[in-house]
Amino acid sequence: ARGKPDIRTQVMVQRSLDTRLPLIYLNLVGGQDDQVFDGASFILNQGGKLAVKLPQFEEATELVEFQEQDGKWSALPGTKYVCKTEMSQDYRAMSEGLKDYVIKSGFSKVVLGLSGGIDSALVATIAVDSLGAENVMCVRLPSKISSKHSLDDAQNLIDNLQCKFETISIENCQEAVINSLSSLFMGLHTDVTEENIQSRIRGLLLMALSNKFGSMLLTTGNKSE
């Protein structure tokens, strides 16, 4: 959660002050189901003074020496990692969460639909950063109303990411579904129903690719959807 590192530090500083002792805070790093742990383990000396802080969202090991003076122990200064911006933290959390979820679920590859919009572009970028371009397949699924601008944007992203891609037209599938429903829809105005058929077809084709090639299917919707 945003602001969690600052809250964590404040609580631990207060604990160090209360006990008048050095404090070692160890934190898991990586994703576990829907939880993402940011690492960033740290050591505070008596009085809450920071001695060591390890990186966020990275596995790290550091040898720390303690010294005694006048009967009081303190850690010698070491790495002091500076947390990145909140937006950078958000991106790293999504990247680490995706990577660990895919791997711990027994997959090594992913597949996703690429529309040319910002949602799927961000998911594709996170996937490539997390798993490597060779393990990501992006699929364009155009219909007869797909704009050239959207298709070009999708192609530009694929060129930049250097990941595998395929293009599968959904026009034939869409026509088959509409024809199957034509007698029931006769006399009714075209509305969101026909639009939603497109997304259902895309989902069906992407799931087929996922099943056939053993790739995890990534969704690309945002909270508004």
Per-range role (PLM):
Residues P22-L26, F42, M137-V139, E166-I168, ...:
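Hydrophobic/aromatic beta-strand patches that form the interior of the parallel beta-sheet core
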Residues Q89-V111, L205-L209:
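Phosphate/ATP-binding catalytic cores across multiple sugar-kinase/actin-like superfamilies
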Residues A1-E58:
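CN hydrolase (nitrilase-like) catalytic-core segments centered on the catalytic cysteine
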Residues E58-E68, N135-T193, S199:
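A conserved beta-strand->alpha-helix junction
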Residues L161, L184-E225:
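Active-site adenylate/phosphate-handling loop in enzymes that bind or generate adenylated species
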Residues K99-S108, D129, A133-V136, N179, ...:
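Conserved helix-loop functional segments at active or binding sites
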Residues S108-L114, I118-Q155:
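ATP-dependent adenylation/pyrophosphate-handling site
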Residues L44, A51-L54, E59-A93:
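Catalytic P-loop NTP-binding/switch module of NTPases
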